[in-house]
């Protein structure tokens, strides 16, 4: 049964509506996880470290797609809630076209930036060569990956979250199968892992382009449009929190790698990469929920339905709290098998990964609330507060903590830094929620 944005959402309906977005985000995160798993076990530790070292740069660039997707879908959903369907499709079309053209230009520039960025991150010798090789291959599909990030949000706004899920599942399975074929069977090494990801990203980005470009049964369709400078600026402002989250994460991940190189060498970077893979999957649950529920919030905000805003906010906080505790418990239980799966071939690296993940996992108790808080304000078209939460969470607090805490606790200080930064951010998020309760009437 099709669920519409205008409906009243029970727990069952809310979970049914956001579930495809959660799975979409999980499969998106699997791209890099599967690459890392095969590279670590079939190519070697140095190539594995190279993937982890250059990935923050690539993810930071692709974050522009998340910015346009989340910021633009909030505007489009609000416009639909106001009953302006034709105008909503104009905005949607403009944003997709800008992403496609901009993505091609950015991909070409990124080809030349991979080498200096890898050097900046501390790569040299064989590690540098692997970073350049893998990074330039992934630049090929950068426009498609940016479009995929845009369409993840717009599939939900179009009331087609299940179609979006199917696209991402097909893309993810393609990546996994080709990783196995290229790396494990044909022994193409690091290039094989890179091209497997490229193929998956092309499917995830181009299929939605064809779907929305033709006559379809959704609320949205690509067509003729005009340049709306104010809407583009509002999209960038509104989605700046998501851009800040991804860009800052890339900067912070690079800083973590530098600190780990200092305290644990190449093993530290490899251990951090393994931990990040699980972090991507766990946190993607919260990001998926935020993406899936945001258009509902935007729609009812546009329709001035305060009772439904309260209903959505209260249910969301309870769901996130339940997932937070569950993920923390799961993380503690899987620390040993996780380390065995990725780095069981090296006892020292195994111990470093296992102990590091158990300390890192305390962040899962908190980060879901901060992710939702930022996305909630984006959905309410308050890009400033959303961006401020993301800026403090992903850049200011994390940089400060990861630079200072290791001076006191050594390598354990690196693993604990994220949880401390999330706790500091939660204080800020909670303050904004209380201060703005009378403005948006969600409490």
What is each stretch, according to the model?
Residues 30-48, 118-125, 181-188, 247-277, ...:
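Helix-terminus/linker motif at the lipid-water interface of multi-pass membrane proteins
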Residues 69, 137-156, 167-175, 193-206, ...:
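Short runs within selected transmembrane alpha-helices of multi-pass transporters and secretion channels
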């Amino acid at each position: 049964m099709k669920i519409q944005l205008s409906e009243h959402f029970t727990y069952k309906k809310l979970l049914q509506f956001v579930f495809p977005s959660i799975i979409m985000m999980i499969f998106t995160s699997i791209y890099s996880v599967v690459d890392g798993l095969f590279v670590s076990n079939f190519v070697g530790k140095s190539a594995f470290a190279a993937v982890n070292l250059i990935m923050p740069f690539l993810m930071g660039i692709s974050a522009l797609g998340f910015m346009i997707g989340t910021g633009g879908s909030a505007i489009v959903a609000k416009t639909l809630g106001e009953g302006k369907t034709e105008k909503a499709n104009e905005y949607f079309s403009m944003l997709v076209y800008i992403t496609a053209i901009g993505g091609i230009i950015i991909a070409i520039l990124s080809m030349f930036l991979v080498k200096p960025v890898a050097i900046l991150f501390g790569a040299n010798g064989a590690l540098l060569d692997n970073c350049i090789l893998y990074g330039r291959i992934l630049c090929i599909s950068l426009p498609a990956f940016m479009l995929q990030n845009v369409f993840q949000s717009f599939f939900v706004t179009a009331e087609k979250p299940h179609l979006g899920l199917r696209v991402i599942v097909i893309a993810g399975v393609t990546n996994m199968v080709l990783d196995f074929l290229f790396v494990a069977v044909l022994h193409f090494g690091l290039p094989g892992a890179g091209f497997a990801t490229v193929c998956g990203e092309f499917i995830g980005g181009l299929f939605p382009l064809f779907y929305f470009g033709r006559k379809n049964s959704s609320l949205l369709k690509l067509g003729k449009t005009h340049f709306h400078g104010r809407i583009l600026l509002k999209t960038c402002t509104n989605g700046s929190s998501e851009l800040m989250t991804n860009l800052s994460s890339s900067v912070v991940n690079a800083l973590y790698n530098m600190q780990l190189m200092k305290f644990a060498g190449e093993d530290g970077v490899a251990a951090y990469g393994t931990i990040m893979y699980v972090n991507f999957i766990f946190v993607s649950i919260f990001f998926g929920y935020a993406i899936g529920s945001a258009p509902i919030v935007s729609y009812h905000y546009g329709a001035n339905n305060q009772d439904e805003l309260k209903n959505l906010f209260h249910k969301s906080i309870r769901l996130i709290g339940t997932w937070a505790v569950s993920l923390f418990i799961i993380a503690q239980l899987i620390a040993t098998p996780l380390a065995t799966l990725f780095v069981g071939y090296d006892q020292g690296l195994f111990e470093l990964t296992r102990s590091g993940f158990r300390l890192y996992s305390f962040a899962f108790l908190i980060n879901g609330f901060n992710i939702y808080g930022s996305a909630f304000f984006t959905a309410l078209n308050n890009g400033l507060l959303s961006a401020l939460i993301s800026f403090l969470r992903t850049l200011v607090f994390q940089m400060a903590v990861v630079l200072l805490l290791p001076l006191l606790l050594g390598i354990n200080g690196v693993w604990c830094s994220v949880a401390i930064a999330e706790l500091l951010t939660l204080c800020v998020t909670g303050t904004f929620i209380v201060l703005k309760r009378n403005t948006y009437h969600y409490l």
